[in-house]
Amino acid sequence: MGGGMIVTLSGELGAGKTTLVRGILRGLGWTGPVKSPSYALVEHYLFSSLYFYHFDFYRFEDPDEWNSTGFAECFRPDSIAVIEWPERVAARLPWVDVAVRLKLAEPGRTLELSAATEAGETCLAQFAALIA
């Protein structure tokens, strides 16, 4: 993952979206606490010169709520944005590099990953190499 990336996380409540974000942050080297942004809408983390924004739009009722948040300013070359419940703001997102769908399945979960940009394809290739 690198600056300028947007990753969306879809799945029902309890599918593990926030848990996955915790794992991503740990993989990037974050050692502090990782909170769910369900009530705050966004939690942010700073890695030297890289910002990491974790959004949760579950509580958004109307996509127009986006206009009053200032969140558009978070999508920049020096940031990574990971978005839970992206379908609530899909029309407002500038692009999506990687889309992740989590599903509950016995005895755990399934994960579907898809890339929509060259940066997303590179990210998924690096991920595949890590788990191979």
Predicted regions mapped to residue ranges:
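The conserved Walker
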Residues: 13
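Short beta-strand-centered segment that lines the nucleotide-binding/catalytic pocket of NTP-utilizing
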Residues: 30-46
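Phosphate-binding P-loop
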Residues: 1-4
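Hydrophobic anchor at the beta1->P-loop junction of P-loop NTPases
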Residues: 7-9
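Short phosphate-coordinating micro-motif centered on Lys-Gly-acidic
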Residues: 61-66, 72-132
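Conserved glycine(s) of the Walker
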Residues: 16
